[in-house]
Structures are given as structure tokens and as C-alpha cells.
């Protein structure tokens, strides 16, 4: 099992994200998210990653939502939005994405995920439910409940 590290909100993390901009999927860049966090000077970073040697090979953001969407989670006061999970191509098929999902589940809170880039089946395989709804960008909305 890999060590999942919280990534600090700083320019070093921006440099680590550079490989994802060069080789990753354009829809998953997280440039605006990181820059927004740096501007807000938020103390709690929502970014997590798995390093392979000194390279960031997989990453995601876990955003806590205080205002629960009653339509999805009527029995919970809070939930996590799993945002833009991505593994660089040369590190795929090593279980890193599954480890990030398990890490998100370890918070024992409901999780809402957006199925981008044909990832719907991946989330379904990990116990998420398809609510047969789309977000404003047209991507599938999937849920996991503890």
C-alpha cells in the first residue's frame, strides 16, 4: 500500500501538478482549484497524492461540503466531494486510484464523485451508486454512502 500525502497549498505543489498539465487529461488539471486555494490562503489543503519516488503519480482533491444536498444525502449533515482523481499514464494500472478511493472512504462520510472521462465504471466497481443524473458539465454523478 502506498503512502497518501496531503499536498500543501504552495508553489511547490503547483510544480508537482505540472506533469499532470503536460501528460494528464485537460479536464482534470486543477489549476484553478490550486490557484484559488493559494489566493484564499486556506490552511487545510484539500489536495492528496501518491508519490512514486520523488514524482507525484496520482492525485485528487477532497472537498468538504457543509451544505448537504438534501436530494442525495438527506440523512447526513456533511459530505465529501471527490474532485478530479487522476493517475498519470505511466503510473496507471498499479492500484493507485483504488488506494485514493479507499483513503477517501476512510473519512466515513458520504462521497459525491463526478464520473469524467469514462470513469463511471471505475466508481461503480468501488461501490458507488449511479444516481442517473448529470452535473452542469454533463458528467455522471455518483455517490457512496458509509
From Swiss-Prot:
Record-given protein name: Uncharacterized N-acetyltransferase SAB1040c
CDD domains named in the record: NAT_SF
Entry EC number(s): 2.3.1.-
Keywords recorded for this protein, A-Z: Acyltransferase, Transferase
Entries under HAMAP family matching the protein: Acetyltransf_YlbP (MF_00824)
InterPro entries membership: Acyl_CoA_acyltransferase, GNAT_dom, YlbP
Domain N-acetyltransferase as annotated: residue spans: 7-146
Record-level Gene Ontology MF annotations: acyltransferase activity, transferring groups other than amino-acyl groups
Source superkingdom: Bacteria
Amino acid at each position: 500500500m502506498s503512502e497518501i500525502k496531503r499536498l500543501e497549498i504552495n508553489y511547490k505543489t503547483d510544480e508537482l501538478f505540472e506533469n499532470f498539465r503536460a501528460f494528464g487529461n485537460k479536464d482534470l488539471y486543477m489549476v484553478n482549484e490550486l490557484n484559488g486555494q493559494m489566493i484564499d490562503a486556506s490552511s487545510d489543503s484539500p489536495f492528496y497524492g501518491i508519490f512514486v519516488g520523488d514524482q507525484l503519480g496520482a492525485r485528487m482533491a477532497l472537498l468538504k461540503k457543509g451544505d448537504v444536498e438534501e436530494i442525495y444525502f438527506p440523512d447526513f449533515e456533511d459530505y465529501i466531494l471527490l474532485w478530479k482523481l487522476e493517475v498519470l499514464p505511466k503510473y496507471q494500472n498499479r492500484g493507485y486510484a483504488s488506494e485514493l478511493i479507499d483513503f477517501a472512504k476512510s473519512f466515513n462520510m458520504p462521497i459525491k464523485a463526478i464520473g469524467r472521462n469514462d470513469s463511471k465504471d471505475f466508481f461503480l466497481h468501488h461501490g458507488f451508486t449511479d444516481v442517473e443524473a448529470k452535473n452542469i458539465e454533463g458528467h455522471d454523478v455518483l455517490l457512496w454512502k458509509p
